[in-house]
Regions:
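N-terminal amphipathic alpha-helix/helix-capping segment at the start of soluble metabolic enzymes
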Residues: 1-19, 77, 268-272
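Structured C-terminal cap/extension of enzyme domains
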Residues: 10, 223-272
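Structural preference for beta-strand elements that scaffold enzyme active sites
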Residues: 16-20, 49-53, 89-91, 108-109, ...
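Glycine-rich, proline-tolerant flexible connector loops at the mouths of alpha/beta enzymes
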Residues: 23-32, 50-72, 237-246
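Alpha-helix-loop-beta-strand connector modules within alpha/beta enzyme cores
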Residues: 38-41, 45, 65-91, 126-132, ...
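Active-site-adjacent loop and "lid" segments of alpha/beta metabolic enzymes
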Residues: 65-73, 109-116, 172-176, 200-225, ...
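Catalytic beta/alpha-barrel core
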Residues: 70-71, 85-96, 108-121, 132-143, ...
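Catalytic alpha/beta core domains of metabolic enzymes, predominantly
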Residues: 129-130, 134-236
């Protein structure tokens, strides 16, 4: 398997787990930074490479009035400051080709949301920057179909590519994770990430917003790591009940270390 370079972090190629973690969306600077600091400290204690994540804009909220974040310009300023303060790589979603250039000036990983994974101009344009690109598999996509997404990006010559499993639509307002997707997608020779928190989301399950079952996050994450997944994606918060987006499927920061410690132990057994 190919390795991918993200600043001074090398991932894939049979190396140990790496983690992308942070709040769903930038709520305010101080709280977002504080969450990132705690997540970094936890990962450092466990010897896990850490990448900070937070969205500057949640463009696909269930309702018009839902909180979306600070937006592109202000959000990128905050992410640049957090990146400097924590001295870690940062990742965030991009939603349109117009966002690619300014986002690439700040972000170490350009992330393509699941709903947009088939948008050729977006995935090609992101890869063309030369930055690492992480594409989330659509909730409507077979694992094998993600090879086509990778091939679009490979046309640019960029090999710093990753793909993420985040669940598959199973009836209305429900997602399931097919564990076969991990060996299938890893056969494409690029690092594969498991989004452990969005995979327990119940899309639109609360009427004007999504719900979720965070109690299943540890179970699914353990199964994914046992299958040999390369990285893990978590949304974490000091108090998910107060979170302005995706609270029901986010992990409490107080739970994060215990969950991750188990996953590191499993990963060491699997990868020797």
């Amino acid at each position: 398997m190919k390795t991918v370079q993200i600043k001074d972090i090398t991932v894939g190629g049979g190396k140990g787990l790496f983690v992308l973690a942070g709040p769903c969306v930038i709520e305010d600077y101080d709280r977002t930074l504080a969450i990132g600091k705690r997540a970094k400290e936890i990962c450092q204690r466990l010897g896990v490479p850490y990448i900070f994540k937070a969205s500057f804009d949640k463009a696909n909220r269930s309702s018009f009035g839902s909180f979306r974040g600070p937006g592109l310009e202000e959000g990128l300023k905050m992410l640049a400051s957090i990146k400097k303060e924590l001295n870690v790589p940062v990742v965030s979603d991009i939603h349109s080709i117009e966002q690619i250039e300014p986002a690439a000036e700040v972000l170490d990983i350009l992330q393509i949301p699941a709903f947009l994974c088939r948008q050729t101009d977006l995935v090609y344009g992101a890869a063309k920057t030369g930055k690492c690109v992480n594409v989330k598999k659509g909730q409507f996509m077979a694992p094998k179909d993600m090879e086509n997404v990778l091939n679009k990006m490979k046309e640019t010559g960029n090999e710093n590519l990753m793909i993420t499993e985040r669940g598959f639509s199973f009836g209305y307002n429900n997602l399931v994770v097919d564990m076969r997707s991990f060996p299938i997608m890893r056969s494409f020779d690029y690092p594969v990430i498991f989004d452990a928190t969005h995979s327990v989301q119940l899309p639109g399950g609360a009427g004007t917003k999504s719900s979720g079952n965070r109690e299943f996050v540890p179970n699914l994450a353990r199964a994914a790591v046992a299958s040999g997944v390369d990285g893990l994606f978590f949304e974490v918060h000091d108090n998910p009940e107060e979170a302005l987006s995706d609270g029901p499927n986010m992990l409490y920061l107080d739970q994060f270390e215990a969950v991750l410690r188990d996953l590191v132990a499993i990963d060491k057994i699997v990868k020797g």
